């Protein structure tokens, strides 16, 4: 088994010459390699809809973890209900932070997402994912290379130093148009906020729509000199 400790660059290769640009091959390898010791961390953005559809073809009972920060858009929670109906066999786990919003406010002050967004992300996203990955050998992410400068060197199989795990990224070669083409082709549900200027959807407190020509991450933590929550730093 390929692990964080035994990982070597280019230790596994995949053909990109298929309709899914290698994604199905990567997922088939991942579930064969890690069996039930791999989880997909899904934010339920549009890339997530593609991955859920592909994962359902490879492993219909796969584990999917959603980091429920308690401050997501209502549209996101409604989408999760639709996904459960569409893919009833998937094991979708809604992971909660240890602190409620009230407890967080008492310890760190009101509106921590404004005063210290890095700490807020750590409490409500990073620590819960750490706990979710503790019993896993690998995890799956929907990162695409064209999303941002920080993601353009992502590989199919990555040594994730942040979580000391293997991170599997099947969609690295997909473009924004290809993601949407797949969603429409398979009539997949998606967050309606995508239709009103939100290419990347996170917590309601820290996500704004993006103007024409903007980077897909521009609406995240606008004005905070921050475009990543910390889950994907290497």
From Swiss-Prot:
Sites where the protein binds [4Fe-4S] cluster: 120-121, 203, 206
Gene Ontology terms: cellular component: cytoplasm
EC identifiers of the protein: 1.8.4.10
PANTHER family according to UniProt: PHOSPHOADENOSINE PHOSPHOSULFATE REDUCTASE (PTHR46509:SF1)
Record's function text: Catalyzes the formation of sulfite from adenosine 5'-phosphosulfate (APS) using thioredoxin as an electron donor.
Protein name as annotated: Adenosine 5'-phosphosulfate reductase
Enzyme class: oxidoreductase
Entry keyword annotation includes Iron: yes
Pathway given in the UniProt record: Sulfur metabolism; hydrogen sulfide biosynthesis; sulfite from sulfate
Top-level taxon: Bacteria
Record's subcellular location: Cytoplasm
GO BP: cysteine biosynthetic process; hydrogen sulfide biosynthetic process; sulfate assimilation, phosphoadenylyl sulfate reduction by phosphoadenylyl-sulfate reductase (thioredoxin)
Subcellular location, principal: cytoplasm
Any Pfam family matching the protein: PAPS_reduct
Family: Belongs to the PAPS reductase family. CysH subfamily.
Cofactor dependency: [4Fe-4S] cluster
Lineage: Bacteria, Bacillati, Bacillota, Bacilli, Bacillales
Organism, scientific name: Bacillus mycoides (strain KBAB4)
Cofactor note: Binds 1 [4Fe-4S] cluster per subunit.
